[in-house]
Swiss-Prot record:
Annotated segments matching region Repeat 2: 80-144
Protein name stated in the entry: Probable ATP-dependent Clp protease ATP-binding subunit
Keywords carried by this UniProt record: ATP-binding, Chaperone, Nucleotide-binding, Repeat
Protein residues bound to ATP: 216-223, 553-560
Region called I, residue ranges: 171-418
GO molecular function, one term: ATP binding
Region of interest (Disordered), residue spans: 823-848
Provenance organism: Mycobacterium leprae (strain TN)
Taxonomic lineage: Bacteria, Bacillati, Actinomycetota, Actinomycetes, Mycobacteriales
Domain of life: Bacteria
Gene: clpC
Family under the similarity heading: Belongs to the ClpA/ClpB family. ClpC subfamily.
Span of domain Clp R: 2-144
Length: 848
């Protein structure tokens, strides 16, 4: 039974126990419950007794006259008397008779009156209160109406505990009055939804089926339209048919919660409908309208939608619903009888310009909440960046969230103590530790000095904290576009500088940045840079991918490496590259692995290898390696990606590709690379060879791929073969990676020009490109160097120079060996040799 007690009813029981202790009584009787009811002071029972002139002091005096005080204060638990238990049982009956699912202070008072024979009833009679009159007073306060019929209608909820008459106790319990909230300025302003609000007013003014349902994507502002209607009602900006209406939002969760027995939910809903029908001025708003279908429908019961249908059809109940497009189709459209009773009102996603106006209208609320100043540039950045980079949500919700989190972030930063205060704390703690150590060592002079230092540090810290609190905290922090970009960077993983650095400066030096990793391939780097610049300059369809390229040419010339460099330039991380080996998708049925298996097939729940990666990292470079090895059906699926920037996976979800760069690599047309004519280290005819190879590659691509596929590609880039100078520069690049690993061991690696030339000669293969160079460096440099490190022939603190013996740089150099010389680095410490001190340890210079 006690689980049905309201918080105030539980407090009455606690106060009754306290009153019994004050009177030294070892029991809790009806008189103590009466004292607890009056002592509580805020419930319906206390208000009723107060209106009859019954005070706590008067009741306490009467109880002492009738019973007197006990001899000794009780200890431990104080039990209820049988009569007090009966009162609590009667309070449950009173609640059930009134149709309430809880026990409040009013029900306990009604139980006292109904019992009628205890000390509490005697006290009330002695104080001149007629028990019948007290009962009527409680019923009137509960219902807000006069007479028996009104009392029956006013079957209140916990609203009865408010202590003031109310005519909407059921609605107050299971809903919220939006017009009252609008009158108290608790609702955010609604900007630019005049058409939707006007359409809702038109539907509400119909004679029958006057029930609009707001349909739109999550976050576009469906609830805001209803709040705008509530504000219009308060301001009188509605037609005569809607004036003086009260707009309530119904919480279906509260209706269902606590309905333990069959019929409880239906009974609550019927009471809500009865109260709405009795008042006649209520418009009901049901958010997440689809929850009506099946709500409360236990075995043998009917759901909320079936209860509402008759009243909705006859116009007896005016209801505004709100739900998303998917849920409307899934739940409402399946129930044709329910669907025809609602009139759809589409709520579309606002434009970026409209979103900026919405943010300006909300600026005052967020500035007051976070105690910051939000600039116009921050609102423009929030709308534009959210629209560009957050693809799985909708405006204005995602832009508002950016503003909100940026304000919260700035406020938290200002409330965090500066680093120098923490440094003071560390110094003070250190001084105290040293002082205690000095005291333990009985070095009292040092302890006194440390005590003075501690006092000085404490005073300095107090002064710095005073400056911080009077300065930084009083200054209004400003949220600008940079703060918005930082928050967006935390959301999406895009490095902040990629958003805030001037795009023009970055794009103009794009070739320079790419060439830090790509040797040669001027045409390829320029073509990629130009395509990206066109995209970022806004001269490309924003719905298409940022760029789509076919990288063709011989193997080992840098096609994949350029893709990685492009990913690092655009998104700040090599991991932003999604690399897919198309050789794994050579059969028709393997295409499902790429985009997701259809329902009923193995792997349906796992999603596709491509679509899932892009959904998780929508800002990335996608590399389709060796595209010619894939099945033809995959090309057909990629047509939609190349044209519209989107793809539907096996689970029906739309994956957005508009922020990706698509790169297809191919070796078509390069089968003649093994022929000796015009290949290898080219001399004068290199350009003619390249044009001949480029023409053949293009011809082969046209034979292998359909025209509609090639027509959607931004650019086809044929890579050059590598020249001797480019191979030597590539040696520098690869050796620098080995040198960086040696730096960790405090060793420096240097190569002579002859050593580089020999590595280039041995590492380049006209068929395999530059990939064998990596193996050559591993075999000739890394393997030998690792042995010398293990034999301690070279070690930390040395400069290792790699050279070759007996080779003039012109011959084949097949028998020439590399030499490794370790020389100790020049010391940066004082020269001890002049003082006659020679350092020992470490290997002597070794030449092999």
């Amino acid at each position: 039974m006690f689980e049905r007690f309201t918080d105030r009813a539980r407090r009455v029981v606690v106060l009754a126990q306290e009153e019994a202790r004050m009177l030294n009584h070892n029991y809790i009787g009806t008189e103590h419950i009466l004292l607890g009811l009056i002592h509580e002071g805020e419930g319906v029972a206390a208000k009723s007794l107060d209106s009859l002139g019954i005070s706590l002091e008067a009741v306490r005096s009467q109880v002492e006259d009738i019973i007197g005080q006990g001899q000794q204060a009780p200890s431990g638990h104080i039990p209820f008397t049988p009569r007090a238990k009966k009162v609590l049982e009667l309070s449950l009956r009173e609640a059930l008779q009134l149709g309430h699912n809880y026990i409040g202070t009013e029900h306990i008072l009604l139980g006292l009156i109904r019992e009628g024979e205890g000390v509490a009833a005697q006290v009330l009679v002695k104080l001149g209160a007629e028990l019948t009159r007290v009962r009527q007073q409680v019923i009137q306060l509960l219902s807000g109406y006069q007479g028996k019929e009104a009392a029956e209608a006013g079957t209140g909820g916990r609203g009865g505990e408010s202590g003031s008459p109310s005519t909407s106790l059921v609605l107050d319990q299971f809903g919220r009055n939006l017009t009252a909230a609008a009158m108290e300025s608790k609702l955010d302003p609604v900007i630019g939804r005049e058409k939707e609000i006007e359409r809702v007013m038109q539907v509400l003014s119909r004679r029958t089926k006057n029930n609009p349902v707001l349909i739109g994507e999550p976050g576009v502002g469906k609830t805001a339209v209803v709040e705008g209607l509530a504000q219009a009602i308060v301001h009188g900006e509605v037609p005569e048919t809607l004036k003086d209406k009260q707009l309530y939002t119904l919480d279906l969760g509260s209706l269902v919660a606590g309905s333990r027995y069959r019929g409880d939910f239906e009974e609550r809903l019927k009471k809500v409908l009865k109260e709405i029908n009795t008042r006649g001025d209520i418009i009901l708003f049901i958010d997440e309208l689809h929850t009506l279908v099946g709500a409360g429908a236990a075995e043998g019961a009917i759901d909320a939608a079936s209860i509402l249908k008759p009243k909705l059809a006859r116009g007896e109940l005016q209801t505004i619903g709100a739900t998303t497009l998917d849920e409307y189709r899934k739940y409402i459209e399946k129930d044709a009888a329910l669907e025809r009773r609602f009139q759809p009102v589409q709520v579309g996603e606002p434009t970026v310009e409209h979103t900026i106006e919405i943010l300006k209208g909300l600026r005052d609320r967020y500035e007051a909440h976070h105690r910051v100043s939000i600039t116009d540039s921050a609102m423009v950045a929030a709308a534009t960046l959210a629209d560009r980079y957050i693809n799985d949500r909708f405006l204005p919700d995602k832009a508002i969230d950016l503003i909100d989190e940026a304000g919260a972030r700035m406020r938290i930063r200002r409330m965090t103590a500066p680093p120098d205060l923490r440094e003071f704390d560390e110094k003070i703690a250190e001084a105290r530790r040293e002082k205690e150590s000095a005291i333990d060592a009985q070095d009292f002079e040092k302890a006194a000095s440390l005590r003075d230092r501690e006092k000085q540090l404490v005073a300095q810290r107090a002064e710095r904290e005073k400056q911080w609190r009077s300065g930084d905290l009083d200054v209004i922090a400003e949220v600008d576009d940079e703060q918005i970009a930082e928050v967006l960077g935390n959301w999406t993983g895009i490095p902040v500088f990629k958003l805030t650095e001037a795009e023009t400066t970055r794009l103009l030096r794009m070739e320079e940045e790419l060439h830090k990793r790509i040797i040669g391939q001027e045409d390829a780097v320029k073509a990629v840079s130009k395509a990206i610049r066109r995209t970022r300059a806004g001269l490309k369809d924003p719905k298409r991918p940022s760029g789509s390229f076919i990288f063709a040419g011989p193997s080992g010339v840098g096609k994949t490496e350029l893709s990685k460099a492009l990913a690092n330039f655009l998104f700040g991380d090599d991991d932003a590259l999604i690399q897919i080996d198309m050789g794994e998708f050579h059969d028709r049925f393997t295409a499902s692995r790429l985009f997701g298996a259809p329902p009923g097939y193995v792997g349906y729940e796992e999603g596709g290898q491509l679509t899932e990666k892009v959904r998780r990292k929508p800002f990335s470079v996608v590399l389709f390696d060796e595209i010619e090895k894939a099945h033809q059906e995959i090309y057909n699926s990629l047509l939609q990606v190349l044209e519209d920037g989107r793809l539907t996976d096996g689970q029906g979800r739309t994956v957005d590709f508009k922020n990706t760069v698509l790169i297809f690599t191919s070796n078509l047309g390069t089968s003649d690379i093994s022929k000796p004519v015009g290949l290898g280290f080219t001399q004068g005819s290199g350009e003619n060879d390249y044009e001949r190879m480029k023409q053949k590659v293009n011809d082969e691509l046209k034979k292998h791929f359909r025209p509609e596929f090639l027509n959607r590609i931004d650019d086809i880039i044929v890579f050059h073969q590598l020249s001797r100078d480019e191979i030597i520069r590539m040696v520098d690049l690869m050796i620098s990676r080995v040198a960086n690993q040696l730096k960790v061991k405090d060793m420096t690696l240097e190569l002579t020009n002859k050593a580089k030339a020999l590595l280039a000669k041995r590492g380049f293969d006209p068929v395999l490109g530059a990939r064998p160079l990596r193996r050559t460096i591993q075999r000739e440099i890394e393997d030998q160097l690792s042995e010398k490190i293990l034999f301690e022939e070279v070690g930390p603190g040395q400069v290792v120079t790699v050279d070759v013996d007996n080779w003039d740089g012109e011959g084949p150099g097949e028998d020439v060996k590399f030499t490794f010389t370790g020389i100790r680095k020049p010391s940066t410490e004082p020269d001890l040799a002049k003082a006659g001190v020679h350092s020992a340890g470490g290997p002597e210079p070794v030449e092999q």
